[in-house]
Amino acid sequence: MWTYGNPEEREPTGITQGGYSNNIVVDKHFVIKIPESLDLQHAAPLLCAGITTYSPLLKANVKPGDKVGVAGIGGLGHMAIKLAVAKGAQVYAFTTSPKKVEDALSFGAKEAIIVDSLDKLAPYKGKLDYMISTIPAQFDVAAYANVVKPYGSFTQVGMPPGMSLNISAIGLSINRVNFNASLIGGISATRDVVKFCAENKVYPT
């Protein structure tokens, strides 16, 4: 179920109304316990932006010392930076907005690169172990994937208009980078991200 406003035949109104309520009845399988050490205002975003970026990092087995790229520094991107840093990774933030540089560095990124042209990616060619993209628009995927080492992985979580992304097959094949995409995450990983953030004091801002 989407958060809200998504066409859904089962709903009396024809669209989903989301889960923003003081009380709700659900199957216990879907209940996530919030630790007392975690304020609800910090916990709530973890159930969307948090799990959306944590799940790919988990599957990529990001570990201390890994060089991780985060492309797009919005709501998802800032969580990706904080989570990867908390896992001990060296994070390289890529943004087209100069205004996001200070934020990225304050979140713990080792470097923040303003990509006002694709040439700015060239110095990082083949240097990263992994990259997660939160860019919600069409972009040159192969150019960004090129900063990942051969046989490394690139995960797309940003959703462009129309939910479709144009990809250069030859660009990815030349780079030998594994491309995948991810949408939110399962219950087990959601429980993990809540616990991880509580223990490591990773808070959405």
Model segments located where?
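Short hydrophobic alpha-helical segments of the AMP-binding
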Residues: 57, 80, 84, 172
